[in-house]
């Protein structure tokens, strides 16, 4: 098994560089089913890059994340948390990374994730505001 960096995962979707896309696809095929590990940071960077650099819409980002999570070639870090984060991301205002880290934290036994992020605070019961100083 090998792990994939975000740029390799992105190249598999990118038609602007056919040579790198072909190399990334060949690498994944050569590893076989479950032979490529994608960790939580790569998933977050992937979603962020699609949104910020590629200017993709939330629906397309969600579809691409879902395709990664369901592809048999990939072993995903924290797959249950990633799936729950994706479900929240589809309908919520926060970034995928916010939901994913909060789901990981919840699985670790944390009641909430403290944040200053207003979108995350509006998003769900996974987050709580950092209290004001008295």
Which residue stretches match the model-derived regions?
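Acidic, PIN/NYN-like endoribonuclease modules and their adjacent C-terminal/linker elements
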Residues: 1, 102-134
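Residues that scaffold the ATP/ADP-binding catalytic core of kinase and kinase-like folds
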Residues: 11-13, 49, 123-124
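Short beta-strand scaffold positions
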Residues: 4, 37-38, 76, 96, ...
């Amino acid at each position: 098994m090998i792990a994939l960096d975000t740029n390799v995962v992105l190249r598999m979707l990118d038609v602007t560089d056919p040579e790198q896309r072909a190399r990334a696809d060949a690498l994944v095929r050569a590893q076989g089913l479950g032979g490529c590990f994608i960790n939580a940071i790569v998933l977050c960077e992937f979603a962020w890059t699609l949104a910020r650099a590629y200017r993709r819409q939330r629906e397309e980002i969600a579809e691409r994340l879902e395709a990664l999570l369901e592809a048999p070639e990939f072993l995903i870090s924290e797959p249950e948390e990633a799936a729950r984060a994706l479900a929240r991301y589809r309908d919520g205002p926060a970034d995928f990374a916010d939901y994913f880290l909060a789901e990981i934290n919840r699985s670790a036994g944390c009641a909430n994730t403290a944040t200053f992020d207003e979108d995350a605070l509006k998003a769900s019961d996974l987050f709580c505001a950092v209290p004001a100083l008295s």
